């Protein structure tokens, strides 16, 4: 089974259930003291079709005086399935998952008083058991079935899922749960279909904060607060997935680059918030690209940045390579993201102080937009001229 190996690569005599990955590892593949099992009469609820090991394991971990990791010797051997999975992975009927959640939430609430410790455990079950019924297979049910599932999920949210737990979830999970809780089924179905189609959502910058324009965002009829859509982590990943240099061209002794972004909102076209910079090879600092033009997309899908970069300063810096960076400033953090290349490469010869240089704008080995300026000798220039002349003559014939 795939587990957090970092916590189990050495002996840990006293592991905290609430501040460790243990709450995500609730199978019964552990060693339990007999007196713990018998004192608290720990048993598997055999009527649960899936997840029957969880009540046993959770109560054992909650009631244990100490939880230890023993890595000094092999305690026992576990034989995995051929696919490395377990009964709760893969295709499980939606009502089976829902019934599992309906058993686990009140069980945990009976073990732990409301507060951070209960929330730490229920975070795990809200993340997995409670949101899985709100995936694509929900749409395979008839309307009565869909309403029944959503009403039962909503009942669990109402009783057990605090705002603190909700804030820990990925945006799509917490928004779907709130939609189910509000009975907003049409928007819930829309969100499920959009995610199934791998929709790339714009990112809104507003008052120093960052939001995902997921289904229901800034929709008065949906009645969902903005903070439900706030991106608190993972912005760099989202930007790297959606930002691209879509065009690069030589303009005299400059290079003009066009970068498409998913950024929208009142702050997205503010140069104080969004801009471009160059990262010289071998230097930690960034050189801002001055005079960048920010143009909002008419359809509200993003902002396009266009900048003309003088080549002479790049050559004079003595650094043969500069990579393009997108800078996004928010109230919480400044984001510095390498801009992936999605354009046709540019190559040519330019002169600086009577010396020839080879200019290349392309995607480097990591796929990042890079501007390369390398000094070349007269023979190389002559060879390029001969090849170009030969091609022209060949085209003329």
Predicted regions and their residues:
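Donor-binding/catalytic cores of nucleotide-activated saccharide
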Residues: 1-110, 132-138
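A broadly tuned preference for mixed-charge, low-complexity surface segments
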Residues: 43, 120-129, 185-190
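Short, solvent-exposed segments of well-ordered alpha helices
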Residues: 95, 121, 246-249
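Inter-helical turn/loop segments and adjacent helix faces that build the functional surface
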Residues: 111-117
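P-loop NTPase catalytic cores that bind/hydrolyze ATP
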Residues: 117-141
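Basic, ligand-binding patches in group-transfer machinery
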Residues: 136-397
């Amino acid at each position: 089974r795939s587990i957090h190996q970092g916590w189990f690569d050495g002996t840990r005599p006293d592991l905290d259930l609430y501040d460790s990955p243990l709450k995500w590892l609730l199978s019964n593949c552990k060693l339990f003291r007999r007196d713990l099992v018998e004192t608290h009469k720990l048993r598997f609820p055999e009527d649960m079709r899936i997840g029957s090991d969880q009540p046993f394991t959770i109560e054992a971990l909650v009631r244990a005086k100490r939880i230890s990791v023993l890595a000094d010797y092999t305690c026992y051997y576990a034989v995995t399935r051929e696919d490395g999975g377990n009964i709760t992975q893969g295709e499980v009927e939606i009502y089976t998952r829902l019934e599992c959640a309906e058993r686990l939430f009140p069980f945990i609430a009976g073990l732990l008083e409301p507060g951070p410790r209960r929330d730490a455990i229920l975070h795990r079950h809200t993340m997995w058991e409670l949101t899985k019924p709100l995936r694509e297979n929900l749409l395979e049910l008839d309307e009565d079935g869909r309403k029944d599932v959503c009403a039962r999920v909503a009942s669990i949210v109402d009783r057990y899922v605090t705002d603190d737990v909700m804030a820990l979830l990925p945006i799509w999970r917490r928004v779907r749960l709130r939609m189910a809780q509000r009975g907003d089924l049409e928007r819930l179905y829309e969100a499920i279909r959009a995610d199934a189609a791998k929709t790339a959502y714009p990112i809104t910058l507003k008052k120093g904060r960052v939001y995902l324009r997921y289904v229901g965002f800034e929709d008065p009829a949906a009645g969902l607060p903005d903070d439900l859509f706030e991106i608190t982590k993972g912005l760099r990943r989202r930007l790297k997935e959606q930002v691209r240099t879509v065009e690069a061209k030589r303009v005299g002794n400059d290079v003009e680059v066009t970068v498409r972004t998913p950024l929208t909102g009142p702050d997205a076209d503010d140069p104080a918030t969004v801009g471009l910079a160059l990262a010289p090879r071998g230097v930690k600092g960034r050189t801002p690209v001055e005079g960048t033009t920010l143009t909002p997309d008419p359809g509200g899908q993003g902002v396009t940045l266009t900048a003309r970069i003088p080549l002479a300063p790049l050559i004079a810096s003595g650094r043969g390579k500069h990579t393009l960076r997108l800078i996004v400033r928010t109230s919480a953090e400044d984001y510095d993201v390498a801009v992936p290349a999605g354009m046709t490469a540019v190559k040519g010869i330019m002169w600086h102080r009577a010396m020839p240089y080879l200019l290349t704008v392309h995607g480097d080995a990591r796929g990042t937009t890079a501007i390369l300026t390398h000094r070349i000798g007269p023979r190389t220039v002559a060879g390029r001229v001969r090849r170009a002349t030969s091609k022209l003559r060949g085209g003329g014939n």
